[in-house]
A protein has these predicted regions:
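Domain-scale activation on soluble regions of proteins
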Residues: 79, 91-94, 237, 261
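Catalytic domains of carbohydrate-active enzymes, especially glycoside hydrolases
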Residues: 1-11
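Active-site neighborhood of glycoside hydrolase catalytic domains
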Residues: 125-245, 251-254, 259, 266
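Aromatic- and acidic-residue-enriched carbohydrate-binding clefts of CAZyme catalytic domains
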Residues: 12-75, 90-140, 179-198
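Short secondary-structure junction motifs
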Residues: 75-77, 81, 164-168
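Residue-level detector of anion-binding/catalytic polar loops
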Residues: 2-3, 79, 220, 268
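Anion (oxyanion) recognition and catalysis
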Residues: 67, 74, 215, 263-264
Length: 269
């Protein structure tokens, strides 16, 4: 059990430097008073009203610091599994990529949209468990997968520099609220193309696409229990062999069968 689950991003912040995506830390690691979130995120539950204050509300691990942490952990026989929260719990990343879009839109439109995680025309209405209304990546955008692969490749490079092998990346997958993607023209177009009738089923599309991205980069995927639940048999057949681990978190009375259901479906729990 010598594993550190490194949960470096969520709705409230992004806490790891990713070369080439400077906005993730320039914007996504800072919280404070703002009208447009172009320089920092809104304050959250624990405050964070000054984006320049040296408090827990602000800050991030530099690339060098994370590499040092990897080495330190390895010397003590601790394996670190990084998590990229997706497609939900992704508000910090989404806002950061909007800031990137606005920064480059007039001078370099291609660069502006290269890693976009949201669609300006999306009119979907939803509320997450934490009461966010804009924290889910648009899974129909090629730029979403470009973003995910970029982060995965940068993580891989950090592990290599630390003299280690990255085996898996935890992809999150939990708490995608009902109502997402229903008002997205791109998602509706994709659903029609692949024959889906319910927008929420696009979660399956996302995890199968990401499993392929991981495999292409020589990795297996991990995720919360949702990545292994409610799929078609065709999707299960693909995902079983590509999964490194499924983390069952919601096992309160009435849901305690989830662990057995997941294991019986052939996933490593």
């Amino acid at each position: 059990m010598n594993v550190l689950h490194f949960h470096f991003c969520d709705d409230e912040a992004w806490r790891l430097e990713i070369p080439g995506l400077e906005e993730l830390t320039a914007v996504g690691s800072r919280r404070g008073h703002t009208t447009d979130e172009s320089q920092c995120l809104y304050p959250c539950y624990d405050g964070g009203y000054d984006p320049d204050a040296k408090t827990v509300g602000n800050g991030y691990y530099s690339r060098e610091e994370f590499i040092d942490l990897l080495k330190y952990a390895a010397e003590r026989h601790v394996r670190i599994v990084p998590e990229i929260e997706s497609p939900g719990h992704a508000r910090a990343a989404i806002v950061s990529m909007k800031a990137r879009y606005n920064k480059y839109f007039e001078t370099d439109p291609g660069k502006a949209t290269e890693y976009m995680l949201s669609e300006p025309e999306d009119t979907s209405r939803y509320v997450s468990v934490q009461y966010y209304t804009d924290n889910v990546m648009n899974v129909a955008l090629p730029s979403t997968y470009r973003f995910m692969e970029k982060v995965i490749q940068e993580l891989n490079a950090m592990y290599q520099e630390a003299g280690l092998s990255l085996y898996t990346v935890h992809l999150g997958g939990d708490e995608v609220p009902r109502g997402v993607w229903m008002g997205s023209p791109k998602c509706q177009e994709l659903m029609k193309e692949i024959g889906m009738t319910k927008a929420h089923d696009l979660s399956e599309y996302f995890i199968t696409q990401m499993a392929d991205v991981m495999q292409k980069n020589g990795l297996k995927f991990s995720g919360w229990q949702e990545v292994a639940l409610g799929h078609t048999e065709e999707a299960h057949q693909q995902l079983r062999g590509q999964a490194a681990g499924v983390y069952c978190w919601n096992t309160v009375p009435g849901s305690d069968e989830v662990v057995y259901q997941t294991a019986n479906n052939g996933y490593p729990v």
